[in-house]
Swiss-Prot record:
Active site: 121
Function comment: Required for formate dehydrogenase (FDH) activity. Acts as a sulfur carrier protein that transfers sulfur from IscS to the molybdenum cofactor prior to its insertion into FDH.
UniProt gene name: fdhD
Swiss-Prot/TrEMBL GO biological process terms: Mo-molybdopterin cofactor biosynthetic process
Compartment list: Cytoplasm
HAMAP family: FdhD (MF_00187)
UniProt xrefs under InterPro entries: Cytidine_deaminase-like, FdhD
Highest taxon of the lineage: Bacteria
GO cellular component, one term: cytoplasm
Family the entry assigns: Belongs to the FdhD family.
Protein's UniProt name: Sulfur carrier protein FdhD
UniProt: Mo-bis(molybdopterin guanine dinucleotide) binding residues: 260-265
Keywords from the UniProt entry: Cytoplasm, Molybdenum cofactor biosynthesis
Amino acid sequence: MNKKPLEQIKNVTNVTGYRQVSLWKREDLQHPQPDELAEEVPVALVYNGISHVVMMASPKDLEQFAVGFSLSEGIIEHRREIFGMDVVAVCNGLEVQIELSSRRFMGLKARRRALAGRTGCGVCGVEQLNDIGKPVQPLPFTQSFDLANLDQALAHLNDFQPVGRLTGCTHAAAWVRLTGELAGGFEDVGRHVALDKLLGRRAEVGEGWQHGAALVSSRASYEMVQKAAMCGVEILFAVSAATTLAVEVAERCNLTLVGFCKPGRATVYTHPQRLIAG
């Protein structure tokens, strides 16, 4: 592939995730005004020289995305199975070049599939309907979360959306400690990608983020539930609703799924035994 850098992303280590543009407002179509738009670029994950998937994503925090995607898709089981990564600008987007352990790469080749990405859509390109669901080990019940602490987390979720505050165009995913404090978070134009970035960072942090919950600014799709469960996350909070398939998957894998998370409000779909009313 031609390794010419993108005009918009010449330095892949120092990107903002947005671009200055000129546009027109309804009340004045004669005079353009400055504004910001969120960047959306094709990102290819390349394992040991073989391109596996292309996703549309924000061009930030791509190492965390690669780790999280690799874990949540079952390509690896541990962060240490990735030996190295490089982010490279190519003619049509970005590549994350990932060096996998030999054992994991052999497993990937055995079940390799080609996905052509929409915005963070992980179903696009799946060859058969039976390939959509992944086997997930039922989660243990090792923690409880006091819902009285959820409002604190919700109040600070926007802290991890600097591009979203400028553009109104990103989703967020954050890690909530059992105290309600947000330990960290990520944003992306794709909700699944934002969650993958969070899961990747959680794997890098290790024990410090073992207990707690994931909080996403979007709806809860089946795939987000599956990704969380694949990474051992026991509780998933979503600002919007859950789908029927998301609830079915959460029930089956013992994940506590909570939607419509707003100040003073939460709707629990599955496994309320991990929660304390508040």
